[in-house]
């Protein structure tokens, strides 16, 4: 079974002539589910989602056995933060991915950045693209 993955979103690319009997699952769980969350999916985060006020997102991949989407999957388009107990930082992969970050918290800020960068801070009750 041979599946390649795209560079930016880690979408499944089954190799021609492989995946006999599982190709549909590979596409549905490795491509369709990811396209859905990368175009219109919302990742809802609260203070419980963060460890030491930080969260690192990572590209995940799907296969015939499951889509691999988790609460730290980087492919989501919208990230909503609420019920925070302190200012938080989200670190996303360094790629050409766009996020809409919505800070619904009335007290604390949300910073989103790539590893090694300072990032941008979304003020309380604000959103940024």
Predicted regions and their residues:
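Surface-exposed loop/edge segments in extracytoplasmic proteins
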Residues: 117-121
């Amino acid at each position: 079974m041979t599946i390649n993955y795209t560079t930016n979103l880690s979408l499944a690319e089954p190799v021609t002539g492989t995946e006999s009997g599982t190709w549909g699952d590979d596409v549905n769980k490795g491509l369709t589910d990811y396209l859905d969350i990368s175009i219109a999916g919302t990742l809802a985060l609260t203070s419980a989602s963060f460890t030491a006020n930080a969260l690192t997102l990572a590209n995940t991949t799907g296969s015939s056995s499951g889509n691999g989407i988790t609460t730290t999957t980087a492919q989501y388009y919208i990230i909503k933060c609420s019920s925070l107990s302190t200012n938080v930082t989200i670190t996303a992969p360094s790629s050409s991915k766009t996020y809409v970050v919505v800070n619904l918290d009335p007290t604390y800020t949300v910073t989103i950045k790539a590893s090694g960068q300072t990032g941008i801070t979304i003020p309380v009750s604000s959103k940024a693209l």
